[in-house]
Amino acid sequence: MTDNSKIRVVVGMSGGVDSSVTALLLKEQGYDVIGVFMKNWDDTDEFGVCTATEDYKDVAAVADQIGIPYYSVNFEKEYWDRVFEYFLAEYRAGRTPNPDVMCNKEIKFKAFLDYAMTLGADYVATGHYAQVKRDENGTVHMLRGADNGKDQTYFLSQLSQEQLQKTLFPLGHLQKSEVREIAERAGLATAKKKDSTGICFIGEKNFKQFLSQYLPAQKGRMMTIDGRDMGEHAGLMYYTIGQRGGLGIGGQHGGDNQPWFVVGKDLSQNILYVGQGFYHEALMSNSLDASVIHFTREMPEEFTFECTAKFRYRQPDSHVAVHVRGDKAEVVFAEPQRAITPGQAVVFYDGKECLGGGMIDMAYKNGQPCQYI
């Protein structure tokens, strides 16, 4: 049996069941485990539900139960500078950001990793549903989590080889139901705690109300592609491409009874475009441009390859051809795709392996830019 007692693993503990079981499994495997709670958001001046204090109590309870030391570290400044400023800038530009991708890249696997090194860590570990596998050359490959419904490689796609070399994902081979069972068997304080939802720093708060505290909403016209005025929108930042709810025009029909969807935005004119039908022609595209292209292991500066891709979390894979030039890529779809959303991540896969990805800049239909922003 391997002696892991001299290998120190610092676990990012959120107060949830996944990170609790992560710490427990590593402790049972004989590692020298330290728990760390990250406080990334100052909730003292906000209305709504925020659970940071309660979450830290849960971390302390679990750490005491399994017999590991634990600390709390404050990354509020790093979070504001590296994640929240990006989040606001994307909304100002009419895009729909993905703060979870940026949070993993900049906070959980950069600021936290750096902090863990000061504690003498050999590795960091989190409760993400993903797997790492080292090949004979020492290169680490990131693989999808065994639980298809929980796989989180989409959100981890911007991690570097250097970060992956220092990372363990102890839950990657487990189903979520098994994780709950392990927690209940061990009697962990978090065994029955419900999973957190929504963007990390917003929690359960009303999104529109939250965003309006930081960005002034500018109302404007809501129109169909052919120029029919459908009323007023509350501010372009509140809508995302392909969105159905929250338009307030459910009773207005243009010749058919199909529901209305957001099909485009004109930032310069402050117009929100809407159309009827889930597969409205304005929502369909056959290629995209992406930037901030990043691979989890070394790749050529310029190359073309075929793979599968996801354009949003929990979406089935789609076949694509990718041409990479530096940190930019053109991605051509084998089949037309719906509601490709600027600001969201495009993530590349080769079977079970997550290769990396980038951020969507523009979607195209037959070579013409889609008027999504």
UniProtKB/Swiss-Prot annotation:
KW Ion transport (keyword) present: no
GO molecular function: ATP binding; tRNA binding; tRNA-uridine 2-sulfurtransferase activity
Active-site residues (renumbered): C103 (nucleophile), C200 (cysteine persulfide intermediate)
Reactions that this protein is recorded to catalyse: S-sulfanyl-L-cysteinyl-[protein] + uridine(34) in tRNA + AH2 + ATP = 2-thiouridine(34) in tRNA + L-cysteinyl-[protein] + A + AMP + diphosphate + H(+)
EC primary class: transferase
Annotated S-S bridges: C103-C200
Keywords of the record: ATP-binding, Cytoplasm, Disulfide bond, Nucleotide-binding, RNA-binding, Transferase, tRNA processing, tRNA-binding
Keyword tRNA-binding: yes
Binding site for ATP: G12, M13, S14, G15, G16, V17, D18, S19, M38, G127
Enzyme Commission code: 2.8.1.13
Function: Catalyzes the 2-thiolation of uridine at the wobble position (U34) of tRNA, leading to the formation of s(2)U34.
Assigned protein family: Belongs to the MnmA/TRMU family.
Protein name: tRNA-specific 2-thiouridylase MnmA
Organism: Streptococcus pyogenes serotype M28 (strain MGAS6180)
